[in-house]
Amino acid sequence: MSKSQTEGIFGRAVGNLYRGGPANVSWEQALEGLEAGDAERTPNHLPHSAAQLVAHVQFWQAHLLDTLAGKQPATPEHAADGWPAPDDWETLRATFLRDAATLRDHARDPELCAALNREGVPHAAILTSYAGHSVYHLGQVVAVRQALGLWPPPGGGDTW
């Protein structure tokens, strides 16, 4: 297998973590049909609403995009600082999905993935780590929707 083929396979695999793939629904599917009132509801036995989870992941997506752009965003001193209050749901969802698509495209860019950050870590490693974080919380959003009786979404989704 050529280097180009390997890079393409890696890029698709990591890119799919940001948009969904064979092992999970996409963020678009998970958020489909979720209205603001429901997105802001927290089931009694769960710690977060879907909107809170999306705001948290968006915080880190924005942090990663700044990092990849060569900026040095501050890392929160405390975990709670990475959980901003959700803004307007429609705006949050649109911004979140736009940034997830940008990260997917970055993950599919061999030159960007090979580039090193200031600490000498390849961007591919950082993108993969953040993708794992995103998918973890994607599962939580699905669990919140299930607990609220809002799963599967209108367009369908895995029910197990």
Where are these regions (language model features)?
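Acidic/histidine-rich alpha-helical segments that form the ligand environment
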Residues: W83-S134
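Short, contiguous alpha-helical
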Residues: M1-N24, E28-L31, A36-A80, N117-W160
